[in-house]
Amino acid sequence: FSVIIILGGMKVIGFTDVIQVVVLIIGGFATTYVALTLVSDHFGLGKDALAGFKQLMVDSPKHFNLIVDKPTEQSTQEEINKYLMLPGIGMYLAGIWIVNLNYWGCNQYITQRALGADLKTARTGILFAGFLKLLMPIIVMLPGIAAYVLYKNGALQEEMAPGGNFNADNAYSAILGFLPNGMKGLSLAALTAAIVASLAGKANSIATIFTMDIYNKYMDKNASEKKLIKIGKITIVVSIIVSLLFTWDDLLGIGGAGGFTFIQKYTGFISPGVFAMFLLGMFWKRTTGSAGIAGLITGFVLSVCLNKYAPPRFRHETF
């Protein structure tokens, strides 16, 4: 994987993305179909995907709600925890749009993928990617809900709780195991390719930022293009070694929380400040670089303070 990125750069990442997304979509629809037929068959409705979907709506209607109900004094701790993860309509008014606009619009790792041969190509690519994103509830969420319903009703006991230890992260793989052998292998290969492509994009982004914004700007302003490419490749190797060191013996303390959850928590400390800096920089001409840095630092400090002091003060109170 590392050798491929070092030798190929964004060109390899682009080709890999195109291939793996096609396979992922096909495998995703196949997994959803299998999940829904498993539900319908378990409830004696035959192998009917539509009947399986209707059964999900009947059995677990709250899993299809966009807004989680606010907990009451009689609510269980599980219900409170779910609400804290998706805290009502306030999340949509004051949280998600900031995180999403920051991730999709102010993140070099993402914006580098939107570059095209011309403006029209770039715009078309972004719109097409947005359309594919709309498929996520079908190919990702439905199999997870199906696994939940099946487990709750006595199925998938061994798959979801190997050795008697329940793990919700096993939901998708539990459904994936029922795919035909060829499709199962294809889906696993696509998932692996997606992971590799994602890591490749991050590594390339790290190399670009260090080479162009740090090395070429402050360390060697007259560096040739050939030297910059060499520095970029060295940066990729160093970043991969550093990442391996941090994963050794769980140095970051991620534990069983999962890497994605861990990363989202801590990037959330800086995303509001970064987004505000970009927003003001685009629409207010009097914004300066110093003001942007000050806003970024202030936003980070406020986020850390809110994370530490707001939960004990407000508990699950929001609107």
Feature names for model-found ranges:
Residues 1-319:
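Membrane-embedded helix-loop-helix hairpins and adjacent transmembrane boundary segments
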